[in-house]
């Protein structure tokens, strides 16, 4: 099984990283400390300062609290179903924008239960999110105290990094996963193994996703079903089709409603009046509408 050090690369020089006590080092001496929770911050100065910043503590906590309630578990089951159809018995999964790690963890656990041997790496610009993910991974038995030791058999690691400049080697991933995040097309192509079996799986919001919540916070709701498309000029990927998952989730209390709202992009664009209408709800049925689009290498 692939070890995490087999695929990691120095974010400053792209050299191979090795474990030296409580740090990772490359041949040029660039050093990255391993935190107590087990993550290594591979987000280099300057490269993390872009328009796609990482989640802060309040959003990370809201996501962790909401997702632990199980409302979105069906998303991860469907994700695992799609990936499990791939022929590889052993695979490396790269989650590009993993957040606090819930979806990566649930998907990885599901794939292992389907007899896949997994190495999953969740990248996110937020060190808070990666810390949360590493703690969950350890509790679930998918990681170890030092997952970067060459004897480690960790199945799931979370690392703060810029998803548009991933600190991993070329041609190392069987699956790249992008869930409700900006899609780094060039990086996905670079890190995917150049095989017809490799896959970029993109999850995006369907036209009715959270329509009930949006109707409460906005005076008028824009309903659109915008599927991800390969950018003009990109000749690396071709769409292999889209499937939809749509169901109703019953949010049982006001805390769950607020946590869901806090973890959405609507949180920063809603008026105080809109928030007041939403926060007055003690329970709420919401539509979960998600598109799964598979992209294959040309």
List each language-model region with its residue ranges.
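A SAM-dependent methyltransferase catalytic signature shared across enzymes that methylate proteins
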Residues: 16-18, 228-244, 265-276
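A short glycine-rich, Lys/Arg-flanked "PGG" loop and its adjoining helix->strand segment in the class I
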Residues: 185-199
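Conserved class I S-adenosyl-L-methionine
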Residues: 199-229
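Conserved Class I S-adenosyl-L-methionine
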Residues: 5, 245-298
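Class I SAM-dependent methyltransferase SAM/SAH-binding core
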Residues: 92-95, 100-165
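A short acidic, Gly/Pro-enriched loop at the edge of an enzyme's catalytic core
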Residues: 164-175
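N-terminal auxiliary segments of SAM/dcSAM-dependent transferases
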Residues: 1-52
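Class I SAM-dependent methyltransferase Rossmann-like catalytic core
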Residues: 49, 54-78
